[in-house]
Amino acid sequence: MLHYSVVFLVIALIAAVFGFGGIAAGAVEIAKILFFLFAIMAIVSFVVSLIKKN
């Protein structure tokens, strides 16, 4: 489960670079939505992995 947290975090960071950096000017809103979506998924899977570990 921790593996998924890292994957979601990396995807969120890539979406942030494209969305907030202005690289993909036409897809800024989509990149911003993807950033927040994958950031939330990373946090949730990290918390679940901590709960399952105990």
From Swiss-Prot:
<feature type="transmembrane region" description="Helical">
    <location>
        <begin position="6"/>
        <end position="26"/>
    </location>
</feature>
<dbReference type="GO" id="GO:0005886">
    <property type="term" value="C:plasma membrane"/>
</dbReference>
<protein>
    <recommendedName>
        <fullName>UPF0391 membrane protein Pnap_0920</fullName>
    </recommendedName>
</protein>
<keyword id="KW-1133">Transmembrane helix</keyword>
<keyword id="KW-0472">Membrane</keyword>
<comment type="similarity">
    <text>Belongs to the UPF0391 family.</text>
</comment>
<dbReference type="InterPro" id="IPR009760">
    <property type="entry name" value="DUF1328"/>
</dbReference>
<keyword id="KW-0812">Transmembrane</keyword>
<dbReference type="Pfam" id="PF07043">
    <property type="entry name" value="DUF1328"/>
</dbReference>
<keyword id="KW-1003">Cell membrane</keyword>
<feature type="transmembrane region" description="Helical">
    <location>
        <begin position="30"/>
        <end position="50"/>
    </location>
</feature>
